[in-house]
Amino acid sequence: MTKTFKGNAARAKQFFADKMAFTTGPVEISRQIGKKEDVVIIDVRESKDFKKGHVPGAINLPQEKWDTLAGLRRDTMNIIYCYAQNCHMGAHAAMQFAAKGYPVMEMDGGFESWKENGLKIAK
């Protein structure tokens, strides 16, 4: 049985407000790409997986290259994604890049969610 704590609602409200401020979904990103909005899409998966398919226009920046900050921009939003919902590599990258002053969001669900939504895949 789940315990309910007083104050949980306020914590939950803050959590979801923060989550919405720093995550976006694949359909929204696809719309931004289609409208040629000024965003940078960063794929933090391994290079071999990036080559098999990725979000159109994405830049591959695997973990071993995070220190280079290659492709990141300070003047626009950098949208980070990894493999799937249970992959925390995107969140780790976003934290590291944000700590260095880059505006970041994470794509909810990773590349798996992109594919599940039937969106265009680049190779």
Question: Could you describe each region identified by the protein language model?
Answer:
Residues 1-40, 45-49, 123:
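Flexible, polar/low-complexity N-terminal or interdomain linker segments that lie immediately upstream
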Residues 32-33, 66-75:
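Short amphipathic alpha-helix with an adjacent loop that forms part of the alpha/beta core around
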Residues 59, 77, 121-123:
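Short, hinge-like loop/turn segments at secondary-structure boundaries
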Residues 36-41, 56-57, 77:
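Short active-site oxyanion
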Residues 41, 58-60, 104-106:
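Conserved beta-strand scaffold positions in the cores of enzyme catalytic domains, especially
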Residues 50-56, 69-73, 114:
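Short loop/helix-cap segments at secondary-structure boundaries that form the rim of catalytic
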Residues 72-115:
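Catalytic cysteine-centered active loop of the rhodanese-like fold, especially the PTP/DSP P-loop
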